[in-house]
Amino acid sequence: MTHQETLQETLQLAAQKLKAGAPEEALAILEPQRDLCAHAADFWQLLALAHKGMGDSAAAEAAFTSSIAIDPQPHVLTNLANLHRSLRQAETALAYYDQALALASDHLPAQINRARALLDLNRYSDARLAFQTILQANPDHRNATLGLAQASQQLGEQEQALGLFQSVLDGDPTNTVALNGMGISLKTLGYIDDAVNYLQAGAQQAPESPELYTNLASALAQADREDEAVAAYSRALGLSPYDVDLHDWFNGYLGVIAHPQYLDSYRGALEQQPNNVGLATALARKLLLSGRGPEAQSVLEAARSAGGDRPSLETDLSYVYREQGFFNEALVSARSAARLAPQHPDVQRELATALMASGEGYGEALEILDTLLRSYPVDQGLWALCATALRYTDNTERYKRLIDYDRLVQVRTVNAPDEFESLKAFIVYLQDSLNLLHTTQRHPVEQSAVNGTQTLDDLFSRRHHSIDVLKQALEAQLYSVLENLPADDAHPLMSRSTGGLRFSDSWSIKLRDQGFHKNHFHSQGWLSSAFYLRVPDSINYSAAEGWIKFGEPGFRTREPLSAEYWILPREGALVVFPSYLWHGTEPLSQTRERMSVGYDILPT
């Protein structure tokens, strides 16, 4: 047998094994021929696929690179890009897809997967354009249609997404991606029963999909079907037991329905993976927020003893220590984390916070925060901490420019739509509608409200008359606020103003029984606002009871700073303020409820 015949036979046999799903057998065929076939690009391509099938990503990357060095073929570059995408290295993958398309602009696998990499990177507008371009040349391409639907979904275009998903289901009624997509969009729009039906159909078709069961659980929770929601979440965790986000969603739901198994899933998973930092830090934070600081500390110390990532654990230990008032211990942990990972932004953020909490280095904290803000200029949390550092260092002029309450905090009153005889009638209509959405029993521990309830999912994405008229009434006032913002290219708020806006998140809160909001900022906003729908009479004559307050930091400190500015809530009024402002409320003394709608705004 000639050398060429041996090469061809080796490649054919290996390709057959790979096609049959037997990468180990393909590897056994290829490895003995490495020296003989080392000059052949296709040999390295198949070897790479065999290594990838065996889960050896490093060996697969090396073999793909060897193939490309001999002959840079578009399909090999695409396969290398796919490898990086599977490793969640979307930026690197994108570069290789671009190289493949530079060699063959019509290479469809590279086009499709490049668009999916854009989805991975949250570049939804770019992904939408990429999928639209593919569909112009390939109008019946199912994968591209699904990709366009998913991009539209992420851009808030739920109706368009529904039409695209339905077009796939028309030709393939059991397509699980489309069934899942229909369920997500319908849930987002508030059509909960229909969402449950689609997601149940999807779960029947893909009983091993944790994503489908997670989305089904969320829809069942919205439908107030508690037992079924818990069962669906449990099923999802059984399929993906170490998914940190899934544990978070599940326990977030268990917490607000006062379920006795709250936090149990974390402990079960940590018994199997005691060094899992993501699970340990998430559990510790929930324990701390539930008033169980010593347990939180023990969880983190156990993960550290098990060999978990030291910088992350020391960072969270600092947080747990300082919120219990152990300021010196917090600073020791924060500095330890900074020595281990000096360039990590979360580590530096915690060090700055620990320095201020301990009272040991206000100037150093400000230097750290100023450095971070040069890299992350729209981070609302950094601006909140920076404001605190400016106040501690008596940097009055700069603080006044950043925190000018009289200029930056606005109060407006909505106008009732024409269909309502009065503002009071409008308010009562909204109260009645939103009451139906408050289906839980307790406040989420991760959020600011204490003693109350919060609606599930994004409120303003729902398609309901009450939500539509509320948004329109609020937008009329919010655009007026934007029109009156002064121009200032150097200010973190004014410099981003475009005159346009979109809601990035929204919810309704009901406080009761001495309820209040802890001091906090809004990390996902640019402007934030509270709209008041029900206000107890007591706030009019008690000492700031129920009032919204500004300026008091939301972390425990050795030398506390007090609030600086208060506003009296009024039914029908909205308070608008920069998202980076620390704000909370004074506790209520009466059992009567206070109802509000909160929302974050981003410039468009």
Where are these regions (language model features)?
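Start-of-helix register in tetratricopeptide repeats
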Residues: 8, 42, 75-76, 109, ...
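Short coil turns that delineate tetratricopeptide repeat
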Residues: 38, 71-72, 105, 139, ...
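Non-heme Fe(II)/2-oxoglutarate
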Residues: 399-496, 516
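Catalytic core of non-heme Fe(II) oxygenases with the double-stranded beta-helix
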Residues: 461, 465-475, 479-576, 581, ...
